[in-house]
Amino acid sequence: MSGPRIGILALQGDVREHARALTEAGARPVAVRHAVELAEVDGLVLPGGESTTIGRLLRVFELLEPLRAAVAAGLPVFGSCAGMILLARDVVGGRPDQPLIGGLDIVVRRNAFGRQVDSFEAHLEVVGVAGPPVHAVFIRAPWVEKAGDAVEVLARVAEAPVTVRQGPLLATAFHPELTGDARVHRLFVDSVRSSGSGR
């Protein structure tokens, strides 16, 4: 089977849904729960879930420091929802001891659109995604409050950035894995290929 080997952090979240979208986008998805598995991938997806819980699990599974090192070394990573939070340099509304991987020069606000009952769907024009607007599912979603000069905003809801890219890092505040549309995953897989990481 050809295509880059893309890991999915399999501690919490929509692992199967991401795997399905990655397969459709031409990648070979694999579950990542340990550092030895992380070392074998060309790129990584950080799925949604509860960001503080995922952060604690990263410590339990001894993945936090290997992930930070991999991101610093240029591993392409795509974070959706909680994954966006984990890739941020700082979080508004988070716990002061919340572990972050970092890498994206952004400050995000947790639950920016409200609680679970305030979850919603929208159609977004996403830079780099051809075709009709992307159907985006927002579930207790963050948004980007501040972004550094190196961060490219790819999509917004009202004025709030909800999709950003910085070098090999991509993040969405929404869950593209839930809609059956693999175009955002394809954007990431293509970036892995173009980075030279894809085997």
UniProtKB/Swiss-Prot annotation:
Keyword annotations from UniProtKB, A to Z: Glutamine amidotransferase, Hydrolase, Lyase, Pyridoxal phosphate
Keyword flag Glycoprotein: no
UniProt entry tagged with the keyword Lyase: yes
InterPro entries, per the entry: Class_I_gatase-like, PdxT/SNO, PdxT/SNO_CS
Pfam families (UniProt xref): SNO
Gene Ontology molecular function: glutaminase activity; pyridoxal 5'-phosphate synthase (glutamine hydrolysing) activity
Catalytic activity: aldehydo-D-ribose 5-phosphate + D-glyceraldehyde 3-phosphate + L-glutamine = pyridoxal 5'-phosphate + L-glutamate + phosphate + 3 H2O + H(+); L-glutamine + H2O = L-glutamate + NH4(+)
GO CC annotation: cytosol; glutaminase complex
Protein residues bound to L-glutamine: G49, E50, S51, R110, I139, R140
Function of the protein: Catalyzes the hydrolysis of glutamine to glutamate and ammonia as part of the biosynthesis of pyridoxal 5'-phosphate. The resulting ammonia molecule is channeled to the active site of PdxS.
Assigned protein family: Belongs to the glutaminase PdxT/SNO family.
Protein name stated in the entry: Pyridoxal 5'-phosphate synthase subunit PdxT
Gene name linked to the record: pdxT
